[in-house]
Amino acid sequence: MANVSSSNGLDKRPKLRFPGFDEPWKAEKLSDFADRVTRKNSKNETNLPLTISSKDGLVDQVSYFNKTVASKDMSGYYLLKNGEFAYNKSYSVGYDFGSIKRLDRYSMGALSTLYICFALKKHDSDFIKAYFDSLKWYRKIYMISAEGARNHGLLNVPADEFFETKHYLPENTDEQRKIADFIIALDRRIEAQQSLVDNIK
């Protein structure tokens, strides 16, 4: 599946690569490849309140909590559209620096302004989704979050500094696509195996 090249420890040349790709990965600020989304649900375009589950991604609050914890008036919430991302600064078991998830299940939804939302302006969306699912970006957040500074379970991560975080990514979109396709296929296989296990129980 891949060949092996030396790593300099800076994520510039991952040790595991698909054949045919040997260019060093490039450091980019989040702001280089994504724009912040701050549009409000001012006209109540959606009445679907969203929340982020570290395991399941962006989901309907009602389905997730069996109730809505959002305000009845969601006109002040962010309006997030399908394919856009949101960062939940709340920590949970196994996710010490929160979660970044893409909206996949619905065409749009309303999200609390406690979240930091963004839309890609370049790069393969499935690859970026896989990258943020990998938690490789955690050390970037660690560097900008005040140690021990939490407010009601939320990390103290300023939005402007969040968009200044640097990420090593492949410039070649073909490599991005190959990585994304591999991870998608692997996830589907894991889901299928889990389904078999659940049916046996």
Report residues per predicted region:
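Short, solvent-exposed loop/turn positions at domain surfaces
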Residues: 4, 24, 68-74, 151, ...
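A short glycine-rich beta-alpha junction/loop motif
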Residues: 10-14, 108-114, 146-174
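Non-catalytic DNA-recognition/assembly elements of restriction-modification systems
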Residues: 13-41
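Hydrophobic structural patches
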Residues: 15-19, 179-190
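Sequence-specific dsDNA recognition surfaces
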Residues: 31-42, 52-86
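Short coil/turn segments at secondary-structure boundaries
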Residues: 43-51, 144
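A short beta-sheet element
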Residues: 74-137, 150, 158
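Extended intrinsically disordered, low-complexity coil regions enriched in Ser, Thr, Gly, Ala
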Residues: 190-201
